[in-house]
């Protein structure tokens, strides 16, 4: 799954549109200052687009692709906004003869400075993934405040065109869209489109907890493999959290999600949930779905959830499918009995359980040994990121095209590859340091 080309094209075009009018403004002016002005405009456009993606409006996935990839673009737009703002501040954008500075102009300059340093702090918190999620989530909402300050800076700062000129109207319109998006995400949750559900049954599935939900009113329509954002305000879990739906769509609109104790949020949720707990559900989201033709599904741990739903929706014309379920031991495998029943009923579904406590960790060689030739096969994966990355590299050696390796990124908050950079620097500087120590005199 990837960001849609139309979304990338729309983003690029939105950034380049100001260049349509800049040539007519540049004449006789400082080119470096004009470049700084352009950087400031692209920063505003990036922030507005980032705010729009954060709304999770249904059209967002249609334009930018599945929500997991849209959020990745959301992150990089934020980083570009910071970089462009920093360069805009560093490169002098002041021009002579633009008019007299007033108190409002001074306030706009101050707003721009506050916005820059605020963004710098918040982006640093975002990429420093060792900072607890709940603290990041609390600070992240202030990015919208700094966008408001940036828009104020743009509207009232002295510039070589007016807000009523075509360029001024364009950037102002983009800012307005971003401000509407920020207002929408800041509004009370009950104003946002969602469906009301009640918990009807809680079932232990190995180490996981299967939560069955019944609709109160109009039910949610979804496809097998999709996920939702769900919150439980009555038990103090009001922050929406993404969960994959672990059952195929039902005619009566009932849903099931399966929770594993993988973090502070899920542990608290498993303790607090009871039957009749009220829930609000937003979605569905995602484009993880049954592929066409022969396919291999690889699940690790609670990563079985989308495949449990997809197995339930599997038709006789689909596949054939080989489902490899990697779990420490069968006793803690969620939905195993259910999957075995489906595999027994459908000749086009083959279930292979790999117990890592006895058979060792799953790797690309083990997958290839189970499935055979991977050319022309689609591989769908759900599970921990390290195993995903290892399989993505290893399966290529067994003939799998990278375009046929499908997964979703459930890391709503991600860094910028600092771990890989540090690993590279460690590998590079270690031998260099050793050589320097040997070459230096005692």
Predicted regions and their residues:
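Intrinsically disordered, low-complexity segments enriched in polar/charged residues with Gly/Pro
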Residues: 31-33, 38, 50, 54-57, ...
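Membrane-interface capping segments at transmembrane-helix boundaries
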Residues: 25-26, 185-195
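Ferredoxin-reductase
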Residues: 190-277, 322, 327-329, 340, ...
């Amino acid at each position: 799954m990837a960001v849609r080309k139309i979304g990338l094209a729309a983003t690029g075009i939105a950034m380049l549109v100001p260049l349509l009018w800049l040539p007519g403004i540049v004449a006789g002016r400082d080119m470096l200052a004009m470049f700084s002005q352009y950087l400031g405009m692209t920063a505003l456009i990036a922030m507005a687009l980032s705010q729009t993606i954060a709304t999770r409006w249904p059209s967002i996935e249609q334009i930018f692709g599945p929500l997991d990839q849209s959020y990745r673009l959301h992150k990089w737009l934020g980083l570009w906004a910071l970089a462009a703002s920093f360069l805009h501040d560093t490169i002098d954008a002041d021009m002579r003869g633009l008019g007299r500075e007033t108190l409002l102009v001074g306030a706009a300059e101050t707003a721009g400075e506050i916005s820059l340093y605020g963004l710098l702090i918040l982006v640093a918190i975002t990429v420093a993934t060792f900072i607890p999620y709940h603290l990041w989530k609390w600070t992240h909402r202030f990015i919208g405040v700094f966008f408001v300050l940036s828009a104020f800076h743009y509207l009232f700062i002295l510039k070589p065109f007016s807000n009523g000129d075509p360029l001024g109207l364009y950037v102002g319109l983009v800012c307005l869209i971003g401000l509407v998006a920020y207002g929408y995400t800041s509004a009370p949750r009950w104003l946002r489109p969602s469906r009301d559900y009640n918990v009807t049954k809680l079932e232990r599935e190995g180490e996981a907890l299967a939560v069955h939900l019944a609709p109160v009113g109009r039910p949610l329509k979804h496809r097998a493999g999709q996920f939702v954002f769900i919150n439980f305000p009555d038990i103090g879990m009001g922050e929406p959290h993404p969960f994959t739906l672990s059952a195929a769509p039902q005619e009566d609109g009932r849903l099931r999600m399966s929770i594993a104790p993988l973090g502070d949020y899920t542990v608290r949720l498993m303790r607090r949930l009871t039957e009749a707990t009220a829930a609000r559900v937003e979605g569905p989201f995602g484009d993880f779905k049954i592929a066409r033709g022969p396919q291999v599904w690889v699940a690790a741990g609670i990563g079985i959830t989308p495949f449990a739903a997809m197995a339930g929706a599997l038709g006789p014309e689909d596949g054939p499918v080989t489902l490899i379920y990697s779990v420490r031991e069968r006793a803690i495998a969620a939905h195993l009995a259910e999957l075995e029943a489906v595999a027994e009923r459908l000749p086009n579904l083959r279930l292979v359980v790999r117990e890592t406590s006895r058979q060792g960790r799953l790797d690309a060689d083990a997958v290839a040994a189970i499935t055979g030739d991977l050319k022309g096969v689609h591989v769908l994966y759900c599970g921990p990121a390290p195993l995903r990355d290892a399989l993505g590299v290893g399966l290529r050696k067994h003939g799998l095209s990278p375009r046929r390796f499908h997964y979703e990124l459930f890391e709503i908050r991600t860094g910028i590859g600092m771990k890989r950079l540090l690993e590279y620097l460690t590998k590079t500087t270690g031998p260099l340091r050793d050589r320097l120590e040997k070459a230096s005199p005692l």
